[in-house]
């Protein structure tokens, strides 16, 4: 195999993958989904920007500074990267339960349970001489996962076996866990160096904290956090999309009764989804409380010693999961955007409420997703450029392109079977199928172009001959659109001089006839 053959084979593959995404019928919902998500995110930021500059004292420059000033300071940058990991894990913990239709609002409590269990075990139960040279962070992760899963199991048991609404039980457990955690910290592991105004635990030893995970990530807790977060994203995505277990979870989420009719043990899978969500909450606790420089279990975001709230991290995860529509990879994108807003607000000198404003707007636009999925803006562009009369021609064109892709996919499948049976004689980098596909595609495109031009000419000639040309404002607007369609269609034939001259002369003839009718 020569380098030229490899480049040619790779180039054909790229074209195939691009066409498959753009024209394949099986990728139709994916295309619409991506387009809808991008449009909604852009709209949410645009509306946020307009609202900010409309507020007295609001500055548009500060809004754009969210994405620039953040990286001027190393501390802000590290907090930003760690916050991305926190949001990703919180979003995954919520979304995994949502895959079976369960609204897990107890992520904050599960996270706090994991944190208090891990801190108590390491600071009070383990002997002070026990400081492993390597693997202490793994012990921390396991302890916090055990604590988080324990609370998740309680919520799951109440929901599945006692029919207690998971939202009610999780909210109650959130408060119970936070208050018990505060009592345990106050009684056993409180750091009194901060005085009475501040309320936090003793710091976790370096040997157990993600902040000092390894020589590579020493003093870079954000790196270990991102590694954990991205590994979790990949595992969750693979489980949900490529395993029988994942498909059963999504089936139950779509229809509990339908899944029961198929013979699925619904209780079992709902219970397992709670456990996996609890595992993710345990990982979240590890990142939140051991990946920063402080390495303490703090209550400063819930009122310190006067507990007045539960940690907002779990609720951030709910918002992110809803905005991302429970898709693991979208959760990453949304987490980055929200982290930009939350961490970048201070260096950009924006009001602290800006983050909540943008988040609320993004959630509102996320609610419009189902409407956007069925909104087809490109159809309006097609109608504008080739005319309403060619919409059927365009649909036929799309169907033929999809059929051509199906032909190539099937032929490639047969080709792979031949490779298995005859590895010595078969040309592994044969591009003949791709070349035939490209030839078929070119013929389909040429047919589409000629049909569009012919249909436009036929429709206007028929309108002239039947006397339907009226010097009205409506018809004059249609004629203006027709002139735009002429330019658009003729641009297709700029490399086909004969066809270009033919269609150009016919369009000019129609223009003269129509203008003559308008004069009458």
UniProtKB/Swiss-Prot annotation:
Predominant localisation class: membrane
The entry's cellular-component GO terms read: plasma membrane
Record-level Gene Ontology MF annotations: transmembrane transporter activity
Q: Where does it localize?
A: Cell membrane
Q: Which domain of life is it from?
A: Bacteria
The keyword Cell membrane belongs to this UniProt entry's keyword annotation: yes
Q: Which UniProt keywords are given for this protein, alphabetically ordered? A: Cell membrane, Membrane, Transmembrane, Transmembrane helix
Membrane topology type, per the record?
Multi-pass membrane protein
The portions of this protein that span the membrane are 38-58, 84-104, 105-125, 138-158, 167-187, 220-240, 271-291, 318-338, 355-375
This one is known as: Uncharacterized protein MG120
Taxonomic lineage: Bacteria, Bacillati, Mycoplasmatota, Mycoplasmoidales, Mycoplasmoidaceae
